[in-house]
Amino acid sequence: MENINQLIKKVKSLPNCRVQEPTKLPIVDKNKHMLPGDLKEFYSLCGGLTLFENEEYPIHIVTPEEFILANPVIVGELCEEDISSNWYIICNDGKGEYLTINLSEERLGRCYDSFFDRHGIVGESQIIATSFTDLLEKLIKNNGQYWYWLKSEFESLGDAYDDQE
């Protein structure tokens, strides 16, 4: 796996991709959530980025200001009793669909497909990457084509709710 700095350099060299200047780290509730090291490094080096904006499936890694709890945006409320209350928006497709990242200590860094029809639904909340670095690497390799986790050759990483009672 490449490191964050290498991945950002790669994005800067790709056509139809933009890297924003760094501004600040995202603000999270430090009593409940923590930023993974690779995410801290990402936001210290850049302020978000856009991958393959002229392709069929562009994706935006959000700015620190847009890095917010997902449930109030996607569901309309926090849903504190659900594990999805620990998920933050990490990407959007510019059309109202999101990818999220878990900031709870137990599942730190796991990334999920949080499109409107499957976000926070048991059995439908697919783990699409094990860390932010893993997600960024896979999105770059995907070249703006059909979502990699929906392709038949994608090896399942399980569901967000698999280890829930």
Where are the regions a protein language model picked out?
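A short, structured beta-strand/loop element
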Residues: R110-C111
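Compact, glycine/acidic-enriched structural inserts
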Residues: S114-K141
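Structured loops at beta-to-helix junctions and adjacent beta-edge loops in soluble globular domains
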Residues: C91-D93, S104, S131
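Broad, structure-driven detector of short, well-ordered beta-strand segments within folded domains
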Residues: E97-E105
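Helix N-cap / beta->alpha transition motif
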Residues: T63-E66, N102, I128-F132
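A surface-exposed partner-binding patch
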Residues: M1-Y98, K151-F154, G158-E165
